[in-house]
């Protein structure tokens, strides 16, 4: 039996168990259609050892990507460097506003999408693969400039249908285990799943260094992992489905401060 299958079966059986138990530290939402009452970052669900790793910039491996991103930001490629248009201060607060509806492209884009727009439109370079190291360098460096700042995505106007699509995705059961995101992250957070605390599934730590990956990765990669865990068909990185879900998750986080590069298990 493969690792993903074993993990998925463990998840299903554990969820049946936690729903049969009295609530622990979690308070199940009275209205599952609304965001949780008190959003908590994944930071609150870490072991003491992992928490210490995140808090120490010298021990947090994610800062290796941030440092590489600082160099990539200054590097002349194509028609010039990112720094030719943006000094480092100009990046402060930028990551808090994504995903957002882009008027020129007439679609929703996240920070990685904005990086690729700059590459193709300004630097005359091909778009980066969304999980490529250079993309992770740049996205982690830019997001780090907004560390500690609250998210502030727009959900009005043309972004509104995207939010609804993301919400629908969050509540939709999927996969052979027939589970929805909200069953773990709204209804069961704070309960134990095979020795680990179930978190609220908040996105504010990404790009994040995951111990399971032994590397830094994007939120969309984490979404793929979740869907694999319930034996569902995964969406493509950067797909409309994941962009909509990302918008919903950021809105659901209710202005949690950004932590990237976070460390997660």
Language-model-detected regions and their locations in the chain:
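Acidic helix-start/capping segments at beta-turn-to-alpha-helix junctions
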Residues: 82-98, 156-157
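Post-cleavage N-terminal segment of exported redox proteins
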Residues: 2-9, 13-65, 99-164, 187-190, ...
